[in-house]
Amino acid sequence: MIATGIGSLPGTDMRGSLAAMAETFDQLIPLPELPARGVGAHMIGRATAVLVDLPVDHGPGGWRLADSTDHAARSARSWLRSDLDDLEEVLADKEASVKLSFAGPLTLATGLHLRAGESILADGSALADVTTSLAEGVSQLIAELRRRMPRVTWTLQIDEPSAPAVLSGAVPTQSGLYRYPAMAGSTAVQLWQTVVSGCGEAEVGMHCCGAPIPWALARRAGFSTMWCEVTSLLNLDRVAEWVESGARLGMGVVDTMQVDKVPLVDRLIDRVLWLVRRLEIDPAVLKSGILSPACGLAGWSRHDAAEVCRTVKRAGDLVDEQLDQASR
């Protein structure tokens, strides 16, 4: 089974981190985030770095739409360009599969604000403009990367940790006294479809570490993979429908909130087999899945982050045999 990383890593050395990811996750190399470098290297900062014709800046209240970019916004773009240069150098014109990750429109909406300070959730027109800009930026980036690295197959991971809160009306306003209205499912689907369309022929998955996961909406939007934490899955019927429809399941088998606690390989395999039993499906259906940590590892020590990645890889190498045995 393919194994990969899912988000952030500790430290500030992108070239070294990429080399480690390419060695460990050779079937699907993730371009990690290194938030220790500064605000522009965080998840929201990386997403702002691909926005087209929408300047942003970063102030005391966080990221916001602006008349012109500031140092933080320029740093975000600079980090992304540097990261992609490092990726090209590490790959050295080899065939590879690489996964890029960007915050999706619902999560970007909670982390990007209007000039007056409210979230862009308060302005449907602004949200649509940001989503269109994000999709155009991702599209342009993929086209550029295909020219630069023609032997690479690209996968996009759209991070939506805030999707459950946005869809349930749980996001607080600037004052904290109220909540933004719940977003209609049809609106979320339309926003996601815009981003998925911008990804062209690349495989596009959603990563959602919140609950409940919007399985049906994600499928309608065109996502082909859902990355989530295995042990926190709530609606198993939805999960079964997802995998039986032919969509892929990205199984976060390491609880990354348990910082620096590296589980045994057998423990990770047991979590996959547990999921098979709970779903009551043919174990072979999950062989197309992907193993990963549940979320990012930025809060971990470098040693343990590297070790947990190697553990996930070893579990991926062994779990198919266990699934075959479970099918007999």
Residue ranges and their predicted role:
Residues M1-L127, L217-S224, A247, R278, ...:
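Alpha/beta catalytic barrel-like cores
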Residues M14-L18, A76-D85, V130-G137, M183-T194, ...:
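Well-ordered, non-membrane alpha-helical segments in soluble/globular domains
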Residues L18-A22, L80-A96, E136-T153, D237-W242, ...:
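Short amphipathic alpha-helices and their capping/turn segments at secondary-structure boundaries
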Residues K99-G104, R148-S162, K287-S292:
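Active-site groove signature of glycoside hydrolases
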Residues A103-T107, D159-A163, C209-I213, T231, ...:
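Active-site beta-loop-alpha junctions enriched in small/polar residues
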Residues A116-G124, Q157, A163-P164, S168-A170, ...:
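Glycine-rich, often proline-containing surface loops adjacent to acidic residues and nearby aromatics
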Residues S133, G137-L233:
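Active-site loop segments of alpha/beta catalytic cores
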Residues S224-Q325:
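Catalytic-face loop-and-helix region of soluble metabolic enzyme cores
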